[in-house]
Amino acid sequence: MTAFNDRLGALSDAEGRKALAGLRRGLEREALRITSCCQLALDPHPKALGSALTHSRITTDYSEALLEFITPVSGNIEDLLEGLTETHAYTLKHLDGQKLWPVSMPCYVGDVKDIPIAQYGTSNTGRMKTLYRKGLTYRYGALMQIISGVHFNFSLSSDLWPRLHALSGSSLSLDEFISESYFGLIRNYRRLVWVLPYLFGASPAICGSFLKGQKTSLEFEKTAGGTLYLPYATSLRMSDLGYTNKEQASLNISYDSLHDYLQGIREAICLPSAKFAEIGVKVDGEYRQLNANVLQIENEFYAPIRAKRVTRKGEKPSEALARAGVEYIEVRALDVNPFSPVGVEASQLRFLDVFLLYCLLSDSPKSDAVCESEITSNLRAVIHEGRKPGLALSRQGEPVTLKAWLLELFDEFDKLASLLDIDGSDYAEALAQWRMAVEDPALTLSGRVHAAVVEQGMNHGDFVMGLAAKYQDFFLSYPLSPGVEAGFQAEAASSLAAQAEIEASDEESFDEYLKGYFKGVPCALS
């Protein structure tokens, strides 16, 4: 018997199963606005959608054109997706004919200098958000910043933690145990993160225009229509073409404990970068970036998973974690699913439930340099050639085929599904669906995109525009109830009023505001 099986056995009674199934989830989906002429939208964030600074469900990410839809936390997957669908529908009805780009990698961008950085008004808070994005532009270029994805927020039931705490025999307080357990989940997730691009990576091909003279070591093949692809790739979004930060490669952020993690993040925020110093911070009276450190602020740290806690007003993410520990985790390794109108589907979320619970309930040893190297090489292999027949990965120094490893994992996942399926078979069905994609890589999301674009000879841009038009029709005809419509209209108005109130209440200059903000940034744990 393994520790995983022991823990499952201890949770197999009715109360344990109910506690295990009491998961809380949230979604964040990014999507570019595109014009009817297939170009990136260059107009401001639509007023009908409210204030991107203060709206709880509709905001912007890097660009005015890059919408971000945020769901409230929910314990029900169907409710979660219904809410996300309603947000999309309301938005499309107020985009004046514009569509949403339904894949992660952008295409018809035009001149990258024209990509509009997100604007949040004239308040110090809003100006800082825009300046941070301006800094990202100088540091990494605008094109990388408009790559979109889906983030999955996940937390366990408050009823489950006392049972796991008692089962562990830990001498830690319950809050300390919760943080320790979430970091155990994170360590296992990082070892197994390659599973997600294999199943859910959906960017094996890109428009030829995306490279625009970029140097790359990737040996792309080209279709007659100009689409670039790697024959067995899964997620070019997660490759060096996508959202990565070479300056961060030297950072040593530890996931061994909350303390070590916070120490690493705080050191990174205060670590000067010679490369970024060359940009300048304030040149000829105009800011180019918040500072010249490796990270301007904590949000710049790129990772496929993050430990999170809801922040109080004015609180930085690390301060919230230091104050009260980990509250939930954020999965950031998901491509937009082009076969779903909202970029993600229920079977993926059920798989993620099982996958993350497996990471939580399995033993999670601390990492070392050899383990970190293995994590990196396995992920890179799956990103570049995950669908390659017989692809071998490394598991604790020993070679193992991706397929054999995945089938072993799915046998363990099935045990969890049997406990989660209290009234039905939704989890078993989701696992059965994705197990078929282990047996046949053509059934992965990247396999389906490859079939549509490469095997059928369709230009990548045409393929995506066809989906964009289809989903536009779907959302424009989606029936929003009068109450839901009124709710969105009310929040649009109240968010604009809230932004105006913030702007009116500012009393210090922007220079003073920034000085005060960074004065409060500790470079080490006390």
From Swiss-Prot:
It comes from the Bacteria. GO terms for cellular component: cytosol. InterPro entries: Gln_synth/guanido_kin_cat_dom, Glu_cys_ligase, Glut_cys_ligase. It is an enzyme of class 6 (ligase). Keywords: ATP-binding, Glutathione biosynthesis, Ligase, Nucleotide-binding. GO terms for biological process: glutathione biosynthetic process. Its EC number is 6.3.2.2. GO terms for molecular function: ATP binding; glutamate-cysteine ligase activity; metal ion binding. Pathway: Sulfur metabolism; glutathione biosynthesis; glutathione from L-cysteine and L-glutamate: step 1/2. Gene3D superfamilies: 3.30.590.20. It catalyses: L-cysteine + L-glutamate + ATP = gamma-L-glutamyl-L-cysteine + ADP + phosphate + H(+). Belongs to the glutamate--cysteine ligase type 1 family. Type 1 subfamily. PANTHER family: GLUTAMATE--CYSTEINE LIGASE. This is Glutamate--cysteine ligase. It comes from Shewanella amazonensis (strain ATCC BAA-1098 / SB2B).
